[in-house]
Amino acid sequence: MARGRGRHERRGEMPLPSEDEGTMLCIVQRVVGAGFLEVLCTDGEVYMARIPGKMRRRVWMREGDVVLFLPWGTADKKGEVVYRYLRDEVRKLIDMNLLPEELVEEVAGAE
C-alpha cells in the first residue's frame, strides 16, 4: 500500500501568476457547492471557478483563501483553480507586491 505525503512535507515550489499562461491571483468569496467557487480576482472581476477532481479530494477550500486561477477564455467568466496558497505563501505574495493587501483585508472583513 502506498503512503500518503506527511503533513509537514514540502509541497514544492510555489507557482506564481503568469500572463503567458493566463493565470491570475484570486480570493475565494463564496463556496457555491458541487466543486464550484465564486472568486474575486486582482483584475476586479468576479469569476466562477471549478475545482478539478484531483484538488477536490485533497485540498479543502474555504472563504478567504487565495488561489491561482486560470480563466477558460470564454465570455461567461468561468475558469479553473490551479493552486491554493498557504498562509505563509500569501504573505510572500503580498511582500512581492503581486497581491494587494487591501484585497485580502476587504474579503476578510466581509466575512
Curated annotation (Swiss-Prot):
Keywords: Initiation factor, Protein biosynthesis. Gene3D superfamilies: Nucleic acid-binding proteins. GO terms for molecular function: RNA binding; translation initiation factor activity. InterPro entries: NA-bd_OB-fold, RNA-binding_domain_S1_IF1, TIF_eIF-1A, TIF_eIF-1A_CS. CDD domains: S1_IF1A. Residues 12-86 form the S1-like domain. SMART domains: eIF1a (SM00652). The keyword Protein biosynthesis applies. It holds the Pfam family eIF-1a. Belongs to the eIF-1A family. PANTHER family: EIF-1A. Seems to be required for maximal rate of protein biosynthesis. Enhances ribosome dissociation into subunits and stabilizes the binding of the initiator Met-tRNA(I) to 40 S ribosomal subunits. NCBIfam families: PRK04012.1-1, PRK04012.1-3. This is Translation initiation factor 1A. It comes from Aeropyrum pernix (strain ATCC 700893 / DSM 11879 / JCM 9820 / NBRC 100138 / K1). The gene is eIF1A.
